[in-house]
Amino acid sequence: MLDERCLIVEHAEIGSGYRLLVLDAPGIASAVKPGQFVHVRVPALEESALRRPFSVFDAGEDRVSILYKTVGRGTAALNLAKAGESLRVEGPLGKGFPESCSGVALLVGGGYGVAPLYFLARRFAARGIESRLFVGGRTKADLLALDKFDALGVKTFPATNDGSFGTKGFAVVPLDEELRGLREAGSAFEFFACGPDGLLKAVSDRAVSLGVPGWISVDRHMICGVGACYACIQKTVSGNARCCVDGPVFNARDLVWS
């Protein structure tokens, strides 16, 4: 784990309420794996000793990118940071996704849950592993970075609650349609998911019932990042796990959903 002072290279709005933060972070960029996260200290907050956790959207060439949604005081304060300024960033933290896959990698995300999935898709593309993305949002504006997945050659299956783009409904609607075809063809596949709990439970249930690997990135508020505060608990078959050190990526068969 590293603690770097990172220059802000770019900080731009990429949609209503969504921003992309690009940092010069050579140490973290060379060490981080898809699914791991970083802790960012937000100077504008009085309690800035407590850092905010963010998934890594991409990393390489000495840079780390973070895609985030403005949802509270922490991210609202982070919005004020400008290119040319610097931030204290700690990472990489947590356990990420496996970077191997037997068959087709089915990436399932909701909203900004696509953030770690893009990093993973890029790694899979470099290894010649086929990925397919199933992504959901309330409206088309909540479907992020589809052009970047397209550039990797990833076939995308968008879904929106209001039917404004792609299939009407949740991401599991096009996922289930694709699963039928894969099973009929006898194709191997694995699940990789990140997003709201309802989506993660749905993907976990499918992985367990089909007896195939499922890797689930659980979204919790990881305050300390090192397992000390027990604020990011997730129930598992072995008891309570701390998402910041035991996850955030878990095997679907180990998760217990209430």
Residues covered by each model-derived region:
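Short microdomains enriched in Cys/His and/or Lys/Arg
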Residues: 245-258
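Ferredoxin-reductase
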Residues: 2-83
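Short gly/pro/ser/thr-enriched loop/turn and capping motifs at secondary-structure boundaries
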Residues: 140-142, 164-165, 221-225, 250
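Local cysteine-cluster metal-coordination motifs and their immediate loop/turn environment
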Residues: 197, 219-248
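FNR/FR-type flavoprotein reductase catalytic core
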Residues: 73-216
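Short, Lys/Arg- and Gly-enriched loop/turn segments at beta-strand edges
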Residues: 45-54, 94-101, 244
